[in-house]
Amino acid sequence: MQTKPHTLEGWLRHCEQLHPRNIDMGLDRVAEVARRMALRFECPVITVAGTNGKGSSCAMLEAVALQAGYRTGVYTSPHLVHFEERCRGHGEIVSAADLVPHFEAVEAARIQNGNEVSLTYFEFTTLAILRLMSHALLDVAILEVGLGGRLDATNAIDTDCAIITSIDIDHTEFLGPDRESIGREKAGIMRTGRPAIVSDPMAPQSVVDHAREIGADLWSFGRDFNFSGDKQQWNWAGRGRRYAGLAYPSLRGANQLVNASGVLAAFEALRERLPVTAQAVRNGMAMVELPGRFQIVPGQPTLVLDVAHNPHSVAALTANLDAMGFFPTTHAVFGAMADKDLAPMLAKVGPLVDRWYFTDLPTPRAESAAVLQQKWNAVHMVAGGRRDVTSSLHSDPLQALQAAVAAADPAD
């Protein structure tokens, strides 16, 4: 008989070995284990789906709710360094020790009465974190969808307010080949009679149609809420509430106002259960933090960290980099999964980069540095790129970053 793990690290290894596939779309298995655990939330649940902007939206929701004095729980994925980053309670990352009892509870429910249910790594870990949050006496639970929406493990919980951020082409093998089919999957988090905030200014018709079909309370960008602004401040207007003279969100990037607008619409839609003051909105937006989203690290050379991983988010990254002004040389450390649409990503940011540092990543899904370099060469040649651009190969991200920093001048 297999020994039960006693540490978070042990449980994560256990989860990796349980299911034959990393991604297995379907809610039946997750819903069955959730039913066995009697998993439910007493507080309002806000679920966020979208191709890009999910993490930023969750961080803004959390920041404003904390400033309003609410006890918050947030589930996001993936993590950057440590698994525990996926769950925050009252603004703080939970401890590994706090997670272990909930992994034990999921396993007990999974194998209950010898009727074993197979769960993927994501499904198992999601259920463990949801159970922790459901036991935490929260005022609001904020859930970030992992992939799609309709069949995602987070959708085992009925949301009180759905937010759908930008929709673009990504994960086509699971979600469909175009924005309409991808939008339809993401709209699956909506619930009848409950607010559904769609902050994509060009939302696919499939999202609007689904909201109408099920009778969700659809809040559309441009119709039910909007924003305006100048270089100093911005304004927001919803169905019955307005905010004027807001400071720009502390998260950098032109796209963050769209995300912030959806967040404020959600708070207006939930105002009877989660009222927030104008001061909480101002303070929360000014103080929100999120690693890896156009994150500028203090010091020289200027170091920007960004987790852009599809053409849409790379386009936003490129626009944000371009807006930073002139730097003598731009160095790019780049690693990516093999299933990503790499050519348009490289083509978009390519004109801004002078030196590339392609890196392997410690996961089987990753594209090798050598293949990344080949794909960049092909894109570079087609575009008739500059001959003074160089590239190099590295075995891991730290080595690549160290090489880039060593080669850079302070003004780069």
Task: Place the predicted regions along the sequence by residue.
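C-terminal helical cap/extension that packs against the catalytic core
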Residues: I197, P201-S206, H210-G215, W219, ...
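Hydrophobic anchor at the beta1->P-loop junction of P-loop NTPases
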Residues: I46-V48
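Nucleotide phosphate-binding/pyrophosphate-handling subdomain across enzymes
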Residues: P44, H135, V140-V145, D152-I163, ...
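Internal gly/pro-rich beta-alpha loop/helix module
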Residues: D160-C161, F174-I189, G193-V258, L264, ...
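Charged, amphipathic alpha-helical linker segments immediately N-terminal to NTP-binding catalytic cores
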Residues: M1-R21
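Beta-strand->loop->alpha-helix junctions that form or flank phosphate-binding loops
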Residues: Y75, I197-D200, R212-G229, S250-G253, ...
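ATP-dependent carboxylate-amine ligase catalytic core
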Residues: T7, R21-I23, L27, A31-F41, ...
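Hydrophobic positions on the alpha1 helix immediately C-terminal to the Walker A/P-loop
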Residues: S56-M60
